[in-house]
């Protein structure tokens, strides 16, 4: 699962869910449950949920405001959606073990990378130009998309990764 939006203005999905919550969490949940009948009995199969260390910034959950424009903060919505992804992965892993399915579930952080997911963040636009300043900052601070893909590749193929793990760049 690698769908995601980051810091869009307040929008709702067709299903009337706040966009970040709907895409980043509910989308993962629905896709995973749709394909689970195929995966669960395949030895070595894995559900890899791309997430982020942004979940560490969550400082409580306002359950009354999950789907509301009132007090909406686009950065908090992103952080919270990543926490929900990781909680979903841990819960999924527990259920897979209880039912003795062959599939494992893993959360994966690709590292801090400037890609199109950052399109709603003004500073990211500055860092995507070809100026000397942008090139230096990008080299010193951010991972390339190629480097970011390595964490998903590790989650997909490494024998040392166990179900329920949170792996990736900047995590272990």
List where the protein language model places each region.
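Rossmann-fold NAD(P)H-dependent dehydrogenase/reductase core
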Residues: 1-127
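C-terminal helical subdomain
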Residues: 107, 131-172
């Amino acid at each position: 699962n690698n769908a995601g939006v980051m810091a869009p203005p307040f929008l709702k999905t067709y299903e009337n869910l706040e966009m970040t919550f709907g895409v980043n969490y509910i989308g993962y949940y629905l896709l995973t449950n749709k394909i689970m009948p195929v995966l669960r009995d395949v030895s070595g199969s894995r559900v890899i949920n791309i997430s982020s260390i942004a979940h560490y910034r969550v400082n409580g959950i306002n359950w009354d405001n999950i789907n509301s424009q009132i007090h909406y903060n686009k950065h908090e919505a992103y952080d919270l959606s990543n926490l929900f992804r990781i909680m979903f992965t841990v819960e999924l892993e527990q259920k897979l073990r209880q039912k003795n399915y062959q599939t494992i579930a893993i959360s994966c952080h690709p590292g801090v990378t400037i890609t199109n997911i950052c399109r709603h963040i003004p500073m990211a636009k500055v860092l995507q130009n070809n100026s000397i300043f942008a090139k230096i900052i990008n080299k010193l601070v951010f991972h390339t998309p190629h480097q970011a893909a390595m964490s998903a590749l590790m989650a997909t193929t490494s024998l040392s990764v166990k179900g329920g793990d949170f792996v990736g760049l900047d995590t272990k």
